[in-house]
Curated annotation (Swiss-Prot):
Protein name: ATP synthase gamma chain
Organism the protein comes from: Burkholderia lata (strain ATCC 17760 / DSM 23089 / LMG 22485 / NCIMB 9086 / R18194 / 383)
Oligomer and partners: F-type ATPases have 2 components, CF(1) - the catalytic core - and CF(0) - the membrane proton channel. CF(1) has five subunits: alpha(3), beta(3), gamma(1), delta(1), epsilon(1). CF(0) has three main subunits: a, b and c.
Gene that this sequence comes from: atpG
Cited NCBIfam families: ATPsyn_F1gamma (TIGR01146), PRK05621.1-1 (NF004144)
GO cellular component: a single term: proton-transporting ATP synthase complex
Membrane topology of this protein: Peripheral membrane protein
GO annotation, biological process: proton motive force-driven plasma membrane ATP synthesis
Pfam families registered for this protein in UniProt: ATP-synt
Length: 291
Protein backbone atom coordinates (compact mmCIF):
# COMPACT_ATOMS: atom_id res chain seq x y z
CA UNK A 1 0.00 0.00 0.00
CA UNK A 2 2.92 2.33 0.63
CA UNK A 3 3.87 1.99 -3.03
CA UNK A 4 0.35 2.92 -4.14
CA UNK A 5 0.32 5.93 -1.84
CA UNK A 6 3.63 7.09 -3.31
CA UNK A 7 2.29 6.70 -6.86
CA UNK A 8 -0.85 8.69 -5.96
CA UNK A 9 1.40 11.44 -4.64
CA UNK A 10 3.39 11.52 -7.87
CA UNK A 11 0.21 11.68 -9.95
CA UNK A 12 -1.08 14.59 -7.86
CA UNK A 13 2.26 16.39 -8.19
CA UNK A 14 2.37 16.02 -11.99
CA UNK A 15 -1.28 17.11 -12.25
CA UNK A 16 -0.47 20.29 -10.32
CA UNK A 17 2.54 20.93 -12.56
CA UNK A 18 0.36 20.44 -15.66
CA UNK A 19 -2.12 23.02 -14.38
CA UNK A 20 0.73 25.54 -14.08
CA UNK A 21 2.20 24.84 -17.53
CA UNK A 22 -1.28 24.96 -19.10
CA UNK A 23 -1.93 28.35 -17.51
CA UNK A 24 1.47 29.62 -18.67
CA UNK A 25 0.71 28.36 -22.18
CA UNK A 26 -2.53 30.37 -22.27
CA UNK A 27 -0.85 33.50 -20.91
CA UNK A 28 1.97 33.20 -23.45
CA UNK A 29 -0.56 32.80 -26.28
CA UNK A 30 -2.30 36.01 -25.24
CA UNK A 31 0.98 37.91 -24.92
CA UNK A 32 2.17 36.50 -28.25
CA UNK A 33 -0.78 38.04 -30.11
CA UNK A 34 -0.12 41.45 -28.57
CA UNK A 35 3.62 41.17 -29.29
CA UNK A 36 2.91 40.32 -32.93
CA UNK A 37 0.64 43.36 -33.23
CA UNK A 38 3.39 45.63 -31.86
CA UNK A 39 5.92 44.04 -34.21
CA UNK A 40 3.73 44.65 -37.26
CA UNK A 41 2.81 48.17 -36.14
CA UNK A 42 6.49 49.18 -35.93
CA UNK A 43 7.28 48.27 -39.55
CA UNK A 44 5.41 51.11 -41.38
CA UNK A 45 7.23 53.76 -39.32
CA UNK A 46 10.68 52.34 -40.10
CA UNK A 47 9.75 51.93 -43.78
CA UNK A 48 8.56 55.54 -44.08
CA UNK A 49 11.62 56.97 -42.34
CA UNK A 50 13.84 54.87 -44.60
CA UNK A 51 11.97 56.05 -47.72
CA UNK A 52 12.33 59.73 -46.77
CA UNK A 53 16.01 59.30 -45.87
CA UNK A 54 16.58 57.51 -49.19
CA UNK A 55 14.99 60.36 -51.17
CA UNK A 56 16.99 63.01 -49.36
CA UNK A 57 20.28 61.09 -49.55
CA UNK A 58 19.92 60.77 -53.33
CA UNK A 59 18.92 64.40 -53.64
CA UNK A 60 22.04 65.45 -51.68
CA UNK A 61 24.76 63.01 -52.80
CA UNK A 62 27.55 65.36 -51.73
CA UNK A 63 26.68 64.87 -48.05
CA UNK A 64 27.60 61.61 -46.33
CA UNK A 65 26.35 61.06 -42.81
CA UNK A 66 28.84 59.29 -40.46
CA UNK A 67 26.45 56.33 -40.29
CA UNK A 68 26.98 55.78 -44.02
CA UNK A 69 30.79 55.96 -43.91
CA UNK A 70 32.91 52.91 -43.04
CA UNK A 71 35.45 53.44 -40.24
CA UNK A 72 38.14 51.27 -41.81
CA UNK A 73 40.85 52.26 -39.33
CA UNK A 74 38.91 51.26 -36.21
CA UNK A 75 40.03 48.10 -34.43
CA UNK A 76 36.88 47.57 -32.36
CA UNK A 77 33.41 46.38 -33.34
CA UNK A 78 30.18 46.73 -31.40
CA UNK A 79 27.44 44.16 -30.88
CA UNK A 80 23.97 44.83 -29.53
CA UNK A 81 22.75 41.55 -28.03
CA UNK A 82 18.97 41.20 -27.65
CA UNK A 83 17.72 38.40 -25.39
CA UNK A 84 14.86 37.81 -22.96
CA UNK A 85 14.61 38.75 -19.30
CA UNK A 86 12.95 35.45 -18.38
CA UNK A 87 13.51 31.80 -19.18
CA UNK A 88 11.15 28.91 -19.95
CA UNK A 89 11.21 29.70 -23.68
CA UNK A 90 12.94 26.64 -25.08
CA UNK A 91 16.23 27.14 -26.90
CA UNK A 92 15.49 30.74 -27.91
CA UNK A 93 18.30 32.38 -25.95
CA UNK A 94 20.70 29.48 -26.44
CA UNK A 95 20.52 29.82 -30.21
CA UNK A 96 21.17 33.58 -30.32
CA UNK A 97 23.96 33.30 -27.73
CA UNK A 98 25.62 30.55 -29.76
CA UNK A 99 25.46 32.76 -32.87
CA UNK A 100 26.91 35.67 -30.87
CA UNK A 101 29.86 33.57 -29.67
CA UNK A 102 30.56 32.61 -33.28
CA UNK A 103 30.47 36.29 -34.31
CA UNK A 104 32.87 37.18 -31.49
CA UNK A 105 35.31 34.56 -32.77
CA UNK A 106 35.03 35.75 -36.38
CA UNK A 107 35.72 39.37 -35.40
CA UNK A 108 38.61 38.43 -33.11
CA UNK A 109 40.19 36.37 -35.90
CA UNK A 110 40.16 39.56 -37.99
CA UNK A 111 42.01 41.41 -35.24
CA UNK A 112 38.92 43.20 -33.95
CA UNK A 113 38.06 43.70 -30.31
CA UNK A 114 34.37 43.50 -29.42
CA UNK A 115 32.37 45.76 -27.12
CA UNK A 116 28.76 44.85 -26.38
CA UNK A 117 25.44 46.33 -25.36
CA UNK A 118 23.05 43.97 -23.58
CA UNK A 119 19.29 44.21 -23.98
CA UNK A 120 17.75 41.59 -21.68
CA UNK A 121 18.90 39.93 -18.45
CA UNK A 122 19.85 36.62 -20.06
CA UNK A 123 22.22 38.30 -22.50
CA UNK A 124 23.75 40.48 -19.78
CA UNK A 125 24.46 37.46 -17.59
CA UNK A 126 26.01 35.61 -20.52
CA UNK A 127 28.27 38.53 -21.50
CA UNK A 128 29.51 38.88 -17.92
CA UNK A 129 30.30 35.16 -17.71
CA UNK A 130 31.89 35.24 -21.16
CA UNK A 131 34.19 38.06 -20.06
CA UNK A 132 33.04 40.49 -22.75
CA UNK A 133 33.28 44.24 -22.27
CA UNK A 134 29.75 45.58 -21.70
CA UNK A 135 29.41 49.24 -22.68
CA UNK A 136 25.76 49.63 -21.72
CA UNK A 137 22.76 47.60 -20.73
CA UNK A 138 18.99 47.71 -20.39
CA UNK A 139 17.00 44.99 -18.61
CA UNK A 140 13.46 44.41 -17.34
CA UNK A 141 11.75 45.91 -20.38
CA UNK A 142 8.48 44.21 -19.50
CA UNK A 143 5.97 43.02 -22.05
CA UNK A 144 5.73 46.41 -23.78
CA UNK A 145 9.12 47.78 -24.89
CA UNK A 146 9.44 51.56 -25.10
CA UNK A 147 11.97 53.26 -27.36
CA UNK A 148 12.73 55.80 -24.63
CA UNK A 149 14.10 53.01 -22.44
CA UNK A 150 16.23 51.60 -25.27
CA UNK A 151 17.73 54.83 -26.60
CA UNK A 152 20.22 55.40 -23.77
CA UNK A 153 21.89 52.00 -24.12
CA UNK A 154 21.88 52.04 -27.93
CA UNK A 155 23.12 55.64 -28.16
CA UNK A 156 26.41 54.60 -26.56
CA UNK A 157 27.21 52.43 -29.58
CA UNK A 158 25.93 54.99 -32.10
CA UNK A 159 28.04 57.78 -30.60
CA UNK A 160 31.19 55.65 -30.65
CA UNK A 161 30.60 54.81 -34.30
CA UNK A 162 30.02 58.48 -35.18
CA UNK A 163 33.35 59.29 -33.49
CA UNK A 164 35.10 56.69 -35.65
CA UNK A 165 35.94 54.40 -32.73
CA UNK A 166 33.94 51.39 -33.97
CA UNK A 167 34.47 49.68 -37.31
CA UNK A 168 30.90 48.34 -37.38
CA UNK A 169 27.88 47.80 -35.17
CA UNK A 170 25.95 44.52 -35.31
CA UNK A 171 22.69 43.51 -33.71
CA UNK A 172 21.96 39.93 -32.62
CA UNK A 173 18.36 38.93 -31.96
CA UNK A 174 15.75 36.26 -32.70
CA UNK A 175 13.72 36.96 -35.82
CA UNK A 176 10.06 35.97 -35.76
CA UNK A 177 9.17 33.76 -38.75
CA UNK A 178 5.93 32.22 -37.52
CA UNK A 179 4.47 30.77 -34.35
CA UNK A 180 6.40 27.53 -34.71
CA UNK A 181 9.65 28.93 -36.10
CA UNK A 182 12.06 31.59 -34.88
CA UNK A 183 15.62 32.04 -36.07
CA UNK A 184 18.68 33.64 -34.49
CA UNK A 185 20.19 36.32 -36.75
CA UNK A 186 23.06 38.79 -36.59
CA UNK A 187 22.69 41.81 -38.86
CA UNK A 188 24.99 44.72 -39.58
CA UNK A 189 23.45 47.89 -38.21
CA UNK A 190 26.27 50.30 -39.07
CA UNK A 191 27.59 51.39 -41.45
CA UNK A 192 24.32 51.65 -43.32
CA UNK A 193 24.78 50.02 -46.70
CA UNK A 194 23.09 51.07 -49.93
CA UNK A 195 20.79 48.05 -49.52
CA UNK A 196 18.97 49.89 -46.74
CA UNK A 197 17.83 52.50 -49.25
CA UNK A 198 17.29 50.48 -52.41
CA UNK A 199 13.68 49.42 -51.98
CA UNK A 200 11.66 52.64 -51.75
CA UNK A 201 7.99 53.41 -52.43
CA UNK A 202 8.56 54.01 -56.15
CA UNK A 203 8.46 57.82 -55.94
CA UNK A 204 11.21 59.48 -58.02
CA UNK A 205 13.98 61.16 -56.06
CA UNK A 206 12.90 64.59 -57.32
CA UNK A 207 9.27 64.19 -56.21
CA UNK A 208 8.35 65.17 -52.67
CA UNK A 209 5.25 64.97 -50.55
CA UNK A 210 6.87 66.88 -47.66
CA UNK A 211 9.03 69.94 -46.99
CA UNK A 212 11.98 70.32 -44.64
CA UNK A 213 13.71 73.07 -42.65
CA UNK A 214 16.30 74.47 -42.20
CA UNK A 215 18.23 72.31 -44.69
CA UNK A 216 18.53 68.75 -45.96
CA UNK A 217 21.66 67.96 -43.92
CA UNK A 218 20.02 68.65 -40.56
CA UNK A 219 16.99 66.58 -41.52
CA UNK A 220 19.11 63.67 -42.82
CA UNK A 221 21.13 63.69 -39.58
CA UNK A 222 17.97 63.36 -37.51
CA UNK A 223 16.27 60.89 -39.83
CA UNK A 224 19.17 58.44 -39.97
CA UNK A 225 19.44 58.37 -36.17
CA UNK A 226 15.68 57.78 -35.97
CA UNK A 227 15.96 55.08 -38.63
CA UNK A 228 18.69 53.17 -36.78
CA UNK A 229 16.72 53.46 -33.54
CA UNK A 230 13.66 52.11 -35.38
CA UNK A 231 15.72 49.13 -36.59
CA UNK A 232 16.75 48.38 -33.01
CA UNK A 233 13.17 48.71 -31.78
CA UNK A 234 11.98 46.41 -34.55
CA UNK A 235 14.58 43.81 -33.52
CA UNK A 236 13.44 44.02 -29.89
CA UNK A 237 9.77 43.73 -30.94
CA UNK A 238 10.54 40.67 -33.07
CA UNK A 239 12.54 39.14 -30.22
CA UNK A 240 9.60 39.59 -27.84
CA UNK A 241 7.16 38.04 -30.32
CA UNK A 242 9.60 35.15 -30.72
CA UNK A 243 9.92 34.81 -26.93
CA UNK A 244 6.18 34.47 -26.35
CA UNK A 245 5.80 32.06 -29.28
CA UNK A 246 8.66 29.90 -28.02
CA UNK A 247 7.29 29.98 -24.48
CA UNK A 248 3.81 28.99 -25.65
CA UNK A 249 5.24 26.05 -27.63
CA UNK A 250 7.50 25.02 -24.72
CA UNK A 251 4.65 25.13 -22.21
CA UNK A 252 2.38 23.18 -24.56
CA UNK A 253 5.08 20.52 -24.90
CA UNK A 254 5.45 20.45 -21.11
CA UNK A 255 1.68 20.07 -20.67
CA UNK A 256 1.56 17.25 -23.23
CA UNK A 257 4.49 15.50 -21.57
CA UNK A 258 2.82 15.86 -18.17
CA UNK A 259 -0.35 14.29 -19.58
CA UNK A 260 1.71 11.35 -20.88
CA UNK A 261 3.45 10.91 -17.52
CA UNK A 262 0.09 11.00 -15.70
CA UNK A 263 -1.25 8.26 -18.00
CA UNK A 264 1.82 6.11 -17.39
CA UNK A 265 1.64 6.61 -13.62
CA UNK A 266 -2.08 5.87 -13.66
CA UNK A 267 -1.36 2.60 -15.45
CA UNK A 268 1.29 1.67 -12.87
CA UNK A 269 -1.13 2.60 -10.07
CA UNK A 270 -3.90 0.45 -11.55
CA UNK A 271 -1.55 -2.51 -11.92
CA UNK A 272 -0.39 -2.13 -8.31
CA UNK A 273 -3.98 -1.86 -7.10
CA UNK A 274 -4.98 -4.91 -9.13
CA UNK A 275 -2.06 -6.88 -7.69
CA UNK A 276 -3.01 -5.83 -4.15
CA UNK A 277 -6.64 -6.89 -4.66
CA UNK A 278 -5.58 -10.21 -6.19
CA UNK A 279 -3.30 -10.85 -3.22
CA UNK A 280 -6.08 -10.11 -0.72
CA UNK A 281 -8.49 -12.40 -2.56
CA UNK A 282 -5.87 -15.15 -2.60
CA UNK A 283 -5.37 -14.77 1.14
CA UNK A 284 -9.13 -14.91 1.77
CA UNK A 285 -9.55 -18.00 -0.41
CA UNK A 286 -6.54 -19.63 1.24
CA UNK A 287 -7.95 -18.92 4.70
CA UNK A 288 -11.36 -20.31 3.79
CA UNK A 289 -9.79 -23.48 2.41
CA UNK A 290 -7.82 -23.95 5.62
CA UNK A 291 -11.01 -23.76 7.65
Amino acid sequence: MAGMKEIRGKIKSVQNTRKITKAMEMVAASKMRRAQERMRAARPYADKVRAIAAHMSRANPEYRHPFMVANEGAKTAGIILVTTDKGLCGGLNTNVLRATVQKFKELEEKGQKVEATAIGSKGLGFLNRFGAKVLSQVVHLGDTPHLDKLIGAVKTQLDLYSEGKLSAVYIAYTRFVNTMKQEAVIEQLLPLSSEHFEADDGTPATSWDYIYEPDAQAVVDELLVRYVEALVYQAVAENMASEQSARMVAMKAASDNAKTVISELQLVYNKSRQAAITKELSEIVGGAAAV
